[in-house]
Amino acid sequence: MADNEEDVEAEEEYTELTDISGVGPSKAESLREAGFESVEDVRGADQSALADVSGIGNALAARIKADVGGLEVESETEAEVEEEGGEEAPDEDVETELQARGLTEKTPDLSDEDARLLTQRHRVGKPQFNRQDHHKKKRVSTSWRKPRGQLSKQRRGIKGKGDTVEAGFRSPTAVRGKHPSGFEEVRVHNVDDLEGVDGDTEAVRIASKVGARKRERIEEEAEDAGIRVLNPTYVEVEVSE
């Protein structure tokens, strides 16, 4: 009798999707849009199917299954693990390598003049513009400061004392600020920022504050739209012989 009462209480406890641990109104709406209308639908679904729902992910899907599925799911999982553990598979050395996601080899459509100017910019280069006496005093950093002393040899332009910042060192105007590949960089923080990006002349750089889950969605959308990501995520994959 006590066990039956506990089962009834457990069933009555979850009447709405929002009663499940970790599921708020927004995530409940995402579950409904994916076809999970009730708690019973969630209880009968696989963890992988829940993880594919927008805004859920694998970690929250496991939490939902643990909360809704009860102890029966956990005991079955443990039993399966114990049965599989009896046979020890031989260790195989699998060669892996890191590969970048997305269109890493894509190049922009450049005119002959822009291609020439990019080559010129790379060939000529720029001085480092280090601060005067940075190599003499530890407290002096390398960040550029204009020399102002009357006896400063760097200010007077004496050879070997370091270059000073002047307009003549700037890059050609047509390719100024472009990525070495020739793309114009566009900074993105979410999927919506990809709208309006021209994949033939522009490439995106994902902001450093973007999390792993949102970064993955941005990279997938960029690849589908034919847009190159300049700072892609590297994943470990097996090397095919």
From Swiss-Prot:
Amino acid composition bias (Basic residues), ranges on this chain: 133-159
Gene Ontology CC annotations of this record: cytosolic large ribosomal subunit
SUPFAM superfamilies reported in the protein's UniProt record: Rad51 N-terminal domain-like, Ribosomal protein L32e
Sequence segments annotated as region (Disordered): 1-47, 68-182
GO-annotated molecular function: DNA binding; nucleotide binding; rRNA binding; structural constituent of ribosome
Biased amino acid composition, Basic and acidic residues: 29-44, 103-116
Keyword list, A-Z: Ribonucleoprotein, Ribosomal protein, RNA-binding, rRNA-binding
GO BP terms in the entry: DNA repair; translation
Keyword RNA-binding: yes
Composition-biased stretches (Acidic residues): 1-16, 73-96
Family: Belongs to the eukaryotic ribosomal protein eL32 family.
Role description: Binds to the 23S rRNA.
Quaternary organization: Part of the 50S ribosomal subunit. Interacts weakly with protein L15.
Protein's name in the database: Large ribosomal subunit protein eL32
Species of the source: Haloarcula marismortui (strain ATCC 43049 / DSM 3752 / JCM 8966 / VKM B-1809)
